Amino acid sequence: MKILSCLCSYKGCLSSKEANEIILNHNHQNHPDKEVDCFSFADGGEGTLSVLKSIYPDRKTGCYLLPGPIKCNEAQAEYGIQKDTRIIETSKVLGLNLNPDLDFDSTTSFGLGILLKYGLDNGIRKFLVALGGSAIADQGAGARYALGYRFYGKEGKEIFPLSGNLGRIQSVDSTKADQRFKECSFTLLADVKSPLLGENGSTYLFSEQKGAKKEKLPIYENGRKHFNSILVNCGFPDVSMLPSSGAAGGLGSFFYRFGKTKVLSGAEFLLKEAHRKEKIKDYDYVLLGEGHTDRGTLEGKSIMPRLSLIRKSKAKAVLLSGIVDEDVLPELKKQGVSFFCPLHDKACKDYQKSAKEDLEKAYDKFLSLLEK
C-alpha cells in the first residue's frame, strides 16, 4: 500500500512540513508495513515559501523585521528571491499566528506595504505574492498607507486604516503615493476564488476565523462596500466582484487595482513546480488536511485543486482536517473524498496543545477503517 501525505498547514498549529513529518514518523514507528511519502504543501498561501525552498534549496531568501498584523507587534518576514522577482508570502508578515488574540478590528496590512516598499527600493518590479493565511481584512488599506496614501474621516482628520474602521474613511489623498508601484507586475497565488463583496465574499466566508463576531459581519461588509466605493470615486477600477479579489482579507483587490496583475492557482503552481501532478497516480491513498474545512474550502482553497487531480487517478482521497463542517460533507463526497477522519468533532479552544497526538490518532483511525 502506497500513501502520499499531502497535508496543508493547520493554521496556528502545525506547518505543512510539520504535519507531514508527523505522519511519516508515526507510520515508520507504528505501521512499518505501509509505505508513506510526503509532500509538504501549500495552496498559494501559508507555507508557500517553505515548499518552494524544499523544491529549490539553492534559491536565496532574505528576512526583514516588520510590523505584523497588529502594528505594535513585530514579525520576522522572510521573502524569496528568484532572479528579478521578489517572492512574498503574506502570512509571513500578516499571518493569523501573529494575532493570537484574534483582535480583528485592530489588524492592518501596513507591514506588507513596508515589505513591498523595500522591494521597490532594491529595484524590484516583479512580485510573486502568495495570498492566504492572513489575519487582516482591510483590503490592503494599511499597505496603501505604507506606500504614501493618506485617509481622512468626516472632519478631515487623518485616519490610520484598520480592518475595523474602513467605514469611517471619507476620502483618500494619493498625492504622495509611491508612483513606482505603477511600474510593477504581480503574479498572485491564490486558490480562494471568492470576490471581495457579497454573501459569498470574503467577509462572510473568512472573517469569523480571524476573530470577527458573527453578529457584526453585516457592519464589516458595509464598511468594505463603503471603502470600495471611496476608491472607485477616486478613479480606481471596481474590482470587487472579480475572482480572488477577496483573497487574504481583500488583498486580491489591492493588487488588482494596480493593473498588470494575474492570478494563478497556488496549488496548481506548486504541484507543477514540484513535478508532482503526474506522480499522484502512483499512490493508493492521498492524505489531505487543513485546520478547518468549511465553505471557504469549496471556493477553491487548500484541498480542492488536489481533489481534481486525485479524481483523475486510481488514488483515493482521505481528509484529516482539524475540523470539518457538516454542511460541506455532501459536496466533498461528490468531489471524491473517500474517508473523513477529522481531528475534532467541533471547534475547541485548546486543540493546539494536542495537535501532534490528534493527527496521529486520526491517521490510525483511517488505517483501522481500511481493515473493516
Could you say what each language-model-derived stretch is?
Residues 2-131, 135-372:
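N-terminal loops that bind phosphate or other acidic moieties
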